[in-house]
Amino acid sequence: MATTAAAAAAALSAAATAKTGRKNHQRHHVLPARGRVGAAAVRCSAVSPVTPPSPAPPATPLRPWGPAEPRKGADILVEALERCGVSDVFAYPGGASMEIHQALTRSPVITNHLFRHEQGEAFAASGYARASGRVGVCVATSGPGATNLVSALADALLDSVPMVAITGQVPRRMIGTDAFQETPIVEVTRSITKHNYLVLDVEDIPRVIQEAFFLASSGRPGPVLVDIPKDIQQQMAVPVWDTSMNLPGYIARLPKPPATELLEQVLRLVGESRRPILYVGGGCSASGDELRWFVELTGIPVTTTLMGLGNFPSDDPLSLRMLGMHGTVYANYAVDKADLLLAFGVRFDDRVTGKIEAFASRAKIVHIDIDPAEIGKNKQPHVSICADVKLALQGLNALLQQSTTKTSSDFSAWHNELDQQKREFPLGYKTFGEEIPPQYAIQVLDELTKGEAIIATGVGQHQMWAAQYYTYKRPRQWLSSAGLGAMGFGLPAAAGASVANPGVTVVDIDGDGSFLMNIQELALIRIENLPVKVMVLNNQHLGMVVQWEDRFYKANRAHTYLGNPECESEIYPDFVTIAKGFNIPAVRVTKKSEVRAAIKKMLETPGPYLLDIIVPHQEHVLPMIPSGGAFKDMILDGDGRTVY
């Protein structure tokens, strides 16, 4: 991962031309597209990147030292980030991280995006990583700044998101003295990170950063935290860039390419099956092309988890869309009736399986995953392969193409059976006059963007409707807190995705409860003029909890109304007025007939925009398999207007 000094110097020199002269290193314009990992940029609206004026050359060099001259530890840290390919960080300053921010102002490469809360910046780093495949980097000060990262780190661990979080710490001599803003963040985050470091020697910084990025992005991706005391940041040293990583045990345990014999065994099971199903998760986010080719060669229908949305196109005839608690009837039917379950890049999460004993009870199970800890953890497979799913699919496809026999079994009867389920049990909802069904609003958004926008969500009913009613066509198009279920994720994640995909329309489909948790990040999308559209499905309630109250608690309301109890007829808080306070255009709609024109205007307006859509709180997300239930327990109708 380390580059030669000459190559690094050349890269930094080229990048410096683009960055030199930016004040405070914050972008105040829509950025021109640059190379990235992932799908090609798609513009869903009239928004076009604005090319900034050419900056004047600096009066003095940003870094007035030579390669062999000493510099502060904070500058070594920033140079190490540059050598790992970092161009964007999400950092909020404080006393213990000031040196890092000062060093960032001397970087010719890295831009800082100043979110207004550390949780917001960390969710933005997650959105950046999810939407690009690159490592997201966030920086916070010690104490409360560091602890504000906790939810985002836990979220990244559960959803396998590559992140590096860097925290300032009190000076080494003060550690353990309960100094001002001292928190043992390494201990706090030990169980919610893939690995973490406390740097006690300035000379370790190049190696530690190199290792942190390797750990975050290799194997099963995840978050890594690096805690750096302030005196280490201030200490002068000459960096040694050719230091090798010291991870012998970890590297030795990384999965190897799958054995041909195991892949042949999988294909034999495919050949023997009559009702196979592919169960695809977030572990396939880097192997969309290989997955589509495998499906083309075999004709096996595909269902995805919440994390797997987009890894196989939702509009493909062989797509069964999402399975699980709020998955389609036909996806859950297919898993229940299947004789072979190919589980690729999944972890048999409880929201997918329900009653684990009843899940795929008729099927032989093949589980391929890069994390050995997931194999057999929840459901025992008949065949297991611990490997990168991308390599496994490449191997399977090669074997299928080499075969002299017919590569595609005749699953036509199975296809017809599932097509009948699709016709009999489509996703649907009821309409009540001019009330706006939230599902309808998402369908209109899908139609007007042609299913090409990047979608971020908060957590709740709106999240499930966005999963059900938007058409995801490619990996990294869907961004949501799946494992942790962290409200407040949507807006900052959308902003991070926009940074990673300049000029591309990103829509945060949010609920009023989730949106309010990180509403302050409207400031960032306005200041940087990011084309982030916020579409709030506002029912004045904590909708998913209300749904459970309706179904399982005799509709007894227990602190789930989020409006003003003294005047329930008003919309409270007034998101339109709040957005305008951030200088963001905003509109509220209350009638179904207004929705299409309002969404069209939102998409056509350059820069950020907020659309507040008032929806009924009685709507339920359906289908629904109750927690711990099985396919036979699926609920297909009813809402909050019904007495149970």
UniProtKB/Swiss-Prot annotation:
It is found in: Plastid, Chloroplast. It comes from the Eukaryota. Residues 1-43 form a transit peptide. Mg(2+) binds at D512, N539. Belongs to the TPP enzyme family. Residues 47-67 are annotated as: Disordered. This is Acetolactate synthase 1, chloroplastic. Acetolactate synthase is the target enzyme for sulfonylurea and imidazolinone herbicides. The keyword Flavoprotein applies. Keywords: Amino-acid biosynthesis, Branched-chain amino acid biosynthesis, Chloroplast, Disulfide bond, FAD, Flavoprotein, Herbicide resistance, Magnesium, Metal-binding, Plastid, Thiamine pyrophosphate, Transferase, Transit peptide. The lineage of its organism: Eukaryota, Viridiplantae, Streptophyta, Embryophyta, Tracheophyta. Its main location: plastid. One of its GO terms (biological process) is isoleucine biosynthetic process. It holds the Pfam family TPP_enzyme_M. It comes from Oryza sativa subsp. japonica (Rice).
